[in-house]
Amino acid sequence: MNSKIELNVELDENRVPEKLTWSAQDGGIQNEEAKAMMLSVWDSNTQETLRIDLWTKDMPVDEMKQFFHQTLVTMSDTFMRATQDEKMTATMKDFCDYFAEKLELKKN
């Protein structure tokens, strides 16, 4: 069985993203618009992370700060599920709290 996630990027004449959409047919998502995306892929052969970080030119800075904070929080959750390392997860969560405090982000 295969599952497919599709990312589409519309660029302006300077190759700057104007519109980002994504689809995941298995999840019932079709051409859902996004203002930012981060994709990380582990290359086991070279032992390095390959990344694609995209955001539209109209992405507000305050939303970008929230996006980064929420990404850091979910990365710490994923780290815990993948490693069961409670001590490092707590350290990562502390950093997330510090990050939010310094950016004066309100917790929802």
What do the predicted segments below correspond to?
Residues 11-12:
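Short, acidic, Ser/Thr-enriched surface-loop or helix-capping motifs
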Residues 1-7:
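Structured beta-strand/loop patches that form or line metal/cofactor-binding pockets in enzymes
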